[in-house]
Amino acid sequence: MSNYKIKCTTYGGKIGWFLRKHFSQYTSCAYLKLQFALRRKLYKNYIKLFNQRAAENNCFLPCLISIETINRCNSSCSFCPANIKNETRPFQKMDEALFKKIIAELKELNYSGYLNLYVNNEPFMDKRIEDWYRYAKEQLPKAKMLLYTNGTLLTEERFCKIIPYIDKMIINNYTTTMSLHPNVQKLFNFVKNTKEYWNKDITIQIRYINEILTNRSGVAPNKKELMYNNEICVMPFTDFTIYPNGTVGLCCSDATEKTCLGNINNESIFSVWTGKTYQNLREKIANGRSNYPFCKGCDFVDAGIRNMFIKQQLK
């Protein structure tokens, strides 16, 4: 039996849930301080290696490329600036020709990192998402297809259609009661009882919908206060974020698309990634977030995928 049989996590069980629900401000602060401390040396070492490789014209490609195919979500998470109640961006869907241009460029680069068709949205609001993941996987067999979803639109039919092309699926089950959404519960039961999917890496994360997390550079609805710090951030060295109109944003924390590092409609992924705008950003961030206007008050901490990639490169 595979170790990948569908998993559920609550981040600390009932005690963790109680603390996040009733003392969310404190748990957020404690978590962030701990994570910054744990990551500081790791990030410095990776940035040093990244810059060495770049100087030798052998720059690391992004470990995570995120493509937002539609800029809408159907959830109301209080910590997210792109939730259904707070969304301020004009509605946009990515043109298919632009998507295929992106995939063609990644194919030419022999891309083998993570590809995620999601940024600040719900992927299954785009009815093309199953076909686009299939196309991406067929064109980029070495890439690891990553999918984040809240699961509310993920039926058995859509799951069966998309899962052959997904390497890692994370279902963020947002709730107030520490229970699974009815749709997610149905999916959990289906996968649990269908052996052909037991070798798939699927995790359901049971998350408190009103939890205080990070300020996302001041745009998180329930945590707008900025936390001025001089911590470095690794995301300019690991992430490449593309919005539906082709704009390359700084990172997923830029949920209102204030930053622009280039546009894939008239530039290539590689030219943007290795270009002067990105290089100037990295030089500033490598010396602390306070050196870049958008980042100086941000307290966002990266997820585990980046850490795994960094540790592999530093071996």
Predicted regions: what they are:
Residues 67, 71-74, 227, 289-292:
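Processing junctions and N-termini across compartments
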Residues 2-168, 181, 305-311, 315:
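Conserved alpha-helical substructure of the radical SAM core
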Residues 73, 77-80, 233, 251-252, ...:
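Short cysteine clusters
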Residues 103, 126-237, 243:
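Conserved AdoMet/S-adenosylmethionine-binding subsite of the radical SAM
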Residues 52-56, 225-229, 237, 284-286:
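Short, P/G- and charge-enriched loop/turn segments at secondary-structure junctions
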Residues 2-6, 10-13, 188-222, 253-303:
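C-terminal accessory region of radical SAM enzymes
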Residues 63, 236, 255:
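Exposed loop/turn and edge beta-strand positions of beta-sandwich/beta-sheet ligand-binding modules
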